[in-house]
Every structure is written in structure tokens, then in C-alpha cells.
From Swiss-Prot:
Domain SPX: 1-337
Location of the protein in the cell: Cytoplasm
Molecular function in Gene Ontology: ubiquitin protein ligase activity; zinc ion binding
Major place of residence: cytoplasm
Record's signal peptide: none
Entry keyword Cytoplasm: yes
UniProt-recorded name of the protein: Uncharacterized RING finger protein C6B12.07c
ZnF (RING-type) intervals: 374-413
GO cellular component: cytosol
Origin superkingdom: Eukaryota
GO BP of this protein: positive regulation of protein catabolic process in the vacuole; regulation of phosphate transmembrane transport
């Protein structure tokens, strides 16, 4: 009861208007379970009885009546099926099972599916060519009114037992309205949840496109304000990636995807760190501050989508647990197994898809320094030298390696260092760094001037393709 109240209150207070109508209707599903339990009880199938009937035959091989429960699919709708298997030979000595069979047989909710015959006499070579009897029991159909019920249990068994050496196992399907209603309603509501999420994904993807375009204009190195906005947004995105708000990149976090509660705390930490970094202009009307407010709003919207999905997934788990508790039909694992292959139901990809879009569109606008660092000095790899193994190092560090006669690449151990000359300088990458990392390059030059390891003039290699650094 407590979860139902919390679920309803969270939908009303924490979610946008209209989202509650698209969510799982937990209270209505509980009422449906109550009606289903009443239908089962009218057939003598209490939760305790069902638990006994569903016990494996290895527990009680002499069981006269067994029950099996399965779930199938018709389109996106989950369809339940209850099958009662009756062994008439064992039914003679089981008064409880015989009484239950009489109650089921008198009901108009069951249909005979099939009748199988098992011989109690060991087969002989001459018997192998004989065919089993072809006559079967009359079908008990919900639409048929001509079925005669017997006066006593003994008459039922005697008239339907074929012979003393043959035992018949009859399978009957129980069709209950509330059982079908429950799963039809549940899967229909799951589609409503997915429909709302699909709509929200489109809205968020569109917002990402618009925001990325606006940031690319204001943070462009060619803008009138030069590099102020560029470094402002580089710092914002650096803090954002370190925050791991929705998806953790750390191997220690096995789940990787954050819970909405944890994501909310990380989002607040991110906002606090941006304010502490003082990378935003003080004026609230400044374009960078306006775009940052939009960026925060985008993340808060993504957080609501993730919360909505988790709440509904928890509601489904809770309602299926209650279904099993009231009926003992163990439908929960069957249900999740059936909908596992359905791309529309309970898919955990909303946050991942939107975070990927953030990374591929927003973060690609402003290159991060960590992607252009030299692996040796951990500074910008200006005047980048690309070795034959494709690894890139700054010219300053490569000169030191060659001076020390180190031929192995520090990353892959390939013998490429001593082969490097002026042809290995990546001029396109160098121009790119000049455009996006002017401050870092200036600091790099100042550090190199103070480095005692750097002589006034060093030749990278001797010969025709030498590269002289002054």
C-alpha cells in the first residue's frame, strides 16, 4: 500500500503535467488482481492449492492433477494460459483431486485441449504396431451448454476411464477474463510509457541540436570575443565529463548507468563546481550564462525522463510480485522473459542514447585538452610528431628521447623514435592546436625555455631530412 501512495505522489509532484496518465496505473492493476483471485477461488484454486498443483512431479510423482502457467505474445500484448493436467488413473485414489476435478468440470470456464493415453502394462514387440484408442473425452467449452455434469465424483471417473490397463491424461485450458485483462492492461500501459519516452527523446534530441549550434557560434575561435567563451565552455564540459552524471565511465562501477537519485546528486555537484571555477561571466544577461541555464535545463529534463522510466519499471516489478503473492502462479520471471525481446517495453536506453548524443554533438564542438596531450609531459603536444606507429608526442619530448638514444615508442614499444624526422610533424594537427589551444601553447613555450634539457639548437636526425630547432 505504501508504494502505491509514494508512486502516485511522485507522479503528481515530481513529474510534468500529463505524465501521470501515461504511467503504469498501479491502483487499477491491484484491483484487477483482486478480481482475478476471486475468479480462481470460484474454481477452488486458492494460492495454496495452486502452489501444490504447480509443484514439480519429482516432488509428488503420484499427483493426479497438475497445473502449468505460461505467457505468450500476440503482437505487443502478453497472453496468459493456465493448463490443468488430469490423470484419471491416479484420480481414483485421490479424493481431494477428484473433488477438485468435479468442481472444474462443472465450470464453464475450461476447454479440453487434448487427451493422451498412457499404458500401465509393459509393451511387447507385438504391441508396438498397435495404435492408441482414437476416442477422446467430450470437450468442455465455455460456449457449449450441452455438457452434462455427473451426479457423483465416482461416476465422473468411471464413465471417463477407458480401461483398467489404460490411463488417460487430459489437458484442460482455463480461460479467465481477469487474467487476460490484467496482462492486456499492463502491456498496454507499458506501451504508453514508451510512447511518452519516445516523444521526450525527440524533444531532447532537438534541444541538443539547437544548443550545440548556439554554443558553436559563441565559442568559435573566430568570434568577436575571441577565446573567452571558448575557454569558458571548455571548462564547463571538462567538469561535466568528470562528473559522470548519468553514466559512469569508471570500471569499478559495475552498473555504469546511474540511478536517478545518484544522477541528481552528481548534477548538483557539477553545478557547484562550475560556480566555484568562476568560468562564467558575472552578468546574468551574458549569452554564456543564458546558454548554461539551457544546458542545465536540458540535463534536468533528461533526469526526469530517467526517473519516470525507473519509477514505472519499479511499479511493474512490484505489481508482478503482488500478482505472484496472491496467486502463486510465479508469473514475474515469465513476464520479464516474454517482454525482453520487445524493443518497445522497459528498454533502458533513454539515458544512454541522449548522453551519446550529448557527447557526439555538444562536446565535439570544443576540443578538450586531454585529447591532445603528450603522453610523456602531460602537456599540449604542440609541434606534434606522429611516429610510424601513429602515436603522437610533442617535439620537445621526442628530441629528448632521441638524445637519450631511446628507440622504443613509450606507448607501444615499437622501434620508431629514432626514425622520426621533419616529415613526421603533423602540420594539420599543429594548425588545429594553434586555433583551439593558444594559451596552452604559450605556456608550453615558456616551459620549454626554462627547461635545462633543451639546448639552443638540436637536430632531430642528421642527414638530408634533418629538423633543426632554434
Amino acid at each position: 500500500m505504501k508504494f502505491g501512495h509514494d508512486f502516485k505522489r511522485a507522479l503528481e509532484n515530481d513529474m510534468p503535467p500529463g505524465w501521470g496518465e501515461a504511467a503504469i496505473q498501479y491502483k487499477a492493476l491491484k484491483k484487477c488482481i483482486k478480481r482475478f483471485v476471486f475468479e480462481l477461488s470460484s474454481l477452488g484454486l486458492s494460492a495454496e492449492t495452486i502452489s501444490k498443483l504447480m509443484a514439480p512431479t519429482t516432488v509428488d510423482p503420484q499427483q493426479a492433477i497438475t497445473l502449468s502457467y505460461s505467457l505468450g505474445k500476440e503482437g505487443h500484448i502478453v497472453v496468459p494460459k493456465i493448463i490443468i493436467n488430469v490423470n484419471f488413473d491416479k484420480l481414483k485414489t485421490d479424493k481431494f483431486a477428484a473433488s477438485m476435478f468435479k468442481q472444474l468440470n462443472a465450470s464453464n470456464m475450461i476447454t479440453t485441449v487434448r487427451s493422451n493415453y498412457a499404458s500401465n502394462v509393459p509393451s511387447t514387440p507385438s504391441d508396438s504396431t498397435q495404435q492408441p484408442p482414437t476416442n477422446t473425452l467430450p470437450s468442455v467449452s465455455a460456449s457449449s451448454q450441452s455438457v452434462e455434469t455427473c451426479e457423483t465424483v465416482d461416476e465422473d471417473i468411471d464413465t471417463q476411464t477407458m480401461s483398467s490397463d489404460m490411463s488417460e491424461v487430459q489437458s484442460m485450458e482455463i480461460s479467465l477474463n481477469c487474467d487476460h485483462e490484467f496482462f492486456e492492461k499492463l502491456t498496454s500501459e507499458l506501451q504508453s510509457v514508451e510512447g511518452l519516452q519516445r516523444e521526450q527523446r525527440k524533444i531532447l534530441f532537438n534541444a541538443i541540436d539547437i544548443l550545440s549550434h548556439e554554443i558553436s557560434l559563441i565559442a568559435s575561435p573566430n568570434s568577436k570575443k575571441k577565446y573567452k567563451s571558448l575557454y569558458c565552455w571548455r571548462k564547463i564540459f571538462e567538469i561535466y565529463m568528470d562528473s559522470d552524471i548519468f553514466i559512469s565511465c569508471k570500471e569499478a562501477d559495475q552498473s555504469h548507468e546511474r540511478t536517478p537519485e545518484l544522477a541528481e546528486r552528481h548534477l548538483k555537484w557539477f553545478d557547484d563546481q562550475v560556480r566555484l571555477a568562476k568560468c562564467l561571466p558575472s552578468s546574468s544577461k551574458h549569452r554564456d550564462r543564458i546558454l548554461y541555464a539551457k544546458f542545465l535545463e536540458l540535463n534536468e529534463s533528461l533526469l526526469k525522463v530517467a526517473s519516470f522510466q525507473q519509477m514505472n519499471k519499479l511499479a511493474v516489478t512490484k505489481i508482478m510480485k503482488k500478482f505472484d503473492k496472491r496467486t502463486s502462479l510465479t508469473a514475474q520471471p515469465l513476464f520479464f522473459q516474454v517482454i525482453e525481446s520487445d524493443p518497445l517495453l522497459l528498454v533502458d536506453n533513454a539515458s544512454k542514447a541522449i548522453c551519446f548524443s550529448l557527447s557526439s554533438k555538444l562536446f565535439s564542438i570544443i576540443p578538450q585538452l586531454r585529447d591532445f596531450e603528450c603522453a610523456i609531459c602531460s602537456n599540449v603536444a604542440y609541434k606534434p610528431v606522429r611516429l610510424g606507429c601513429s602515436h603522437v608526442f610533442c617535439l620537445h619530448c621526442l628530441i629528448i628521447l632521441q638524445k637519450q638514444k631511446v628507440d622504443f615508442c613509450p606507448l607501444c614499444r615499437a622501434k620508431e623514435v629514432m626514425k622520426a624526422d621533419s616529415r613526421n610533424i603533423d602540420h594539420a594537427l599543429m594548425n588545429f592546436m594553434k586555433t583551439y589551444f593558444p594559451r596552452e601553447i604559450k605556456e608550453k613555450f615558456e616551459e620549454n625555455e626554462n627547461d635545462t634539457f633543451t639546448p639552443s639548437s638540436i637536430s632531430v636526425v642528421s642527414g638530408q631530412n634533418n629538423c633543426v630547432i632554434m
